[in-house]
């Protein structure tokens, strides 16, 4: 499939916490869509190995959330490092989107970009400097159209691939109900 500069790359990461100076990436997934949000390709879901000391140092929320989802055990069993995961994602994305063309798409993606900058800098540079952050529309709906805001039932599973599809669905919802285009 030929790369297309109008496609959008959706990314989500799960991390051991929120501070990229202390925490690390434990899961990352990508999905490529057309501009109209039709899915073109689902990338690999990559679980990144991190040492037990880092996993043990997670706060209670992260231990509980990633424990219930089974992610902690997957991280312990993984042999994939951040550099390997980055390379796999770059190879996948190069098949679908030219470098530097797609904004980084997702929910609260400035957080993902901070972790990419620290631990996957080549992947961070693959994206255009712009972001397509669904949370912007969510915040506008909360303030300007509360009924629209309350109309989207967010599951927040905190699993990278599921969260991407939920972000795409949420943008479709806001496109129809808030933007009305």
Swiss-Prot record:
CDD domains: Orn (cd06135). It is found in: Cytoplasm. Keywords: Cytoplasm, Exonuclease, Hydrolase, Nuclease. One of its GO terms (molecular function) is 3'-5'-RNA exonuclease activity. Gene3D superfamilies: Ribonuclease H-like superfamily/Ribonuclease H. It holds the Pfam family RNase_T. Its EC number is 3.1.15.-. The active site is at 129. One of its GO terms (cellular component) is cytoplasm. Belongs to the oligoribonuclease family. 3'-to-5' exoribonuclease specific for small oligoribonucleotides. This is Oligoribonuclease. It comes from Bordetella pertussis (strain Tohama I / ATCC BAA-589 / NCTC 13251).
């Amino acid at each position: 499939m030929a790369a297309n500069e109008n496609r959008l790359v959706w990314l989500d990461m799960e991390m051991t916490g929120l501070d990229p100076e202390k925490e690390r990436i434990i899961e990352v997934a990508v999905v490529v869509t057309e501009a109209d949000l039709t899915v073109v390709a689902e990338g690999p879901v990559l679980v990144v190995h991190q040492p037990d000391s880092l996993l043990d140092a997670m706060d209670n929320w992260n231990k509980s959330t990633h424990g219930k989802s089974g992610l902690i055990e997957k991280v312990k069993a993984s042999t994939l490092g951040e550099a390997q995961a980055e390379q796999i994602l770059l190879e996948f994305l190069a098949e679908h989107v030219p470098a530097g063309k797609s904004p980084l798409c997702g929910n609260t993606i400035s957080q993902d970009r901070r972790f990419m900058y620290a631990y996957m800098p080549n992947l961070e540079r693959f994206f255009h400097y712009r972001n397509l952050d669904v949370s912007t529309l969510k915040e506008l709906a909360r303030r300007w159209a509360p009924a629209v805001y309350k109309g989207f039932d967010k599951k927040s599973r905190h699993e990278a691939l599921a969260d991407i599809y939920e972000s795409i669905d949420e943008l479709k919802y806001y496109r129809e109900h808030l933007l009305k285009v």
